[in-house]
Amino acid sequence: MQKKYYELFFIVEERYKNLFLDFAFDLGIEAIEEKDNGVYIRSHESLEEFSWALEIFAQKLTTTFNLNHKIISNLSLVEKENKDWIQEYKKGIKPILVDNVYIHTTWQEEKKNCINIKINPALAFGSGHHESTYSCVKFLQKFSKSKLRALDLGCGSGILGIIMAKFGCNVEICDTDELAIDSSLENARLNGVDFHKAWCGSIDKANGLYNLIVANIIADVILILEKDIKNHLEDNAILILSGILDKYSTRIKEKFQDLELIDEIQINEWCSFVYKNNKKG
């Protein structure tokens, strides 16, 4: 084991975080941890060039989105004594119980009398701890039923699709990131379930109507996909929208006011809504 390693830390606005994570993955960065309201990147190789590239990327995003403030802050790069980071990482990840669903890692034991969802967090697309995912897991236990045709839109690690499959739904998944599709398929294999269809892309590539759609994605993307989502809802279908910061909740409700809002949860600043396709007018 090498004696030293480099650690880069930065804070990024939540709505842009996934863009920076994708940027890091594209540059071959593998050791990434979200903690202390920011992002840690660790490597045995110098991260000076990556730090510089990160700042350039942030500047370009600021220009692209016509922002008058910095997207990232508290950027720091330090050299540290090495540890066994694999073991440290494992210690830091705790299982999560949401009603009767128990989400745990591949190295943690299952919980009796629960629906166990096994996730490999090394695949880097979420382990169920985010407030939005938590809300979706609660809702899916209520609305997932056998034989429903279901879509996990923006599947990430596949947790939500796996839960729907465990409840007997015929599940399809999609994500614009091919690595997310690979992650979801691997996690499905770990849990002994199959997805009926998986594709890299969005809902515009979907065929037919769904009885249940869950979209745990950011508000801006939900607003962009609003018409496509509605066009793929079966009569009386259930639509779960999540990943929505409370400051965007009014806009989401306005866009989906032609559907019946039947449930909602807010945890901290994160909102999740459940709609039924009883279209008004």
Curated annotation (Swiss-Prot):
Determine if Transmembrane helix is one of this entry's keywords: no
GO biological process, alphabetically ordered? methylation
Kindly state which keywords UniProt assigns to this record, in alphabetical order.
Cytoplasm, Methyltransferase, S-adenosyl-L-methionine, Transferase
Q: List the disulfide bonds.
A: none
Subcellular location per UniProt equals:
Cytoplasm
What superkingdom does the record give? Bacteria
Reactions it catalyzes: L-lysyl-[protein] + 3 S-adenosyl-L-methionine = N(6),N(6),N(6)-trimethyl-L-lysyl-[protein] + 3 S-adenosyl-L-homocysteine + 3 H(+)
| EC annotation from Swiss-Prot or TrEMBL | 2.1.1.-
| GO molecular function list | protein-lysine N-methyltransferase activity
Per the UniProt record, one Pfam family is PrmA
Q: SUPFAM superfamilies, from UniProt?
A: S-adenosyl-L-methionine-dependent methyltransferases
Positions contributing to S-adenosyl-L-methionine binding: T133, G154, D175, N216
What CDD domains does this protein map onto?
Answer: AdoMet_MTases
What does the UniProt record say this protein does? Methylates ribosomal protein L11.
* The protein's name in its UniProt record: Ribosomal protein L11 methyltransferase
User: What's the source species for this entry?
Assistant: Campylobacter jejuni (strain RM1221)
Gene of this entry: prmA
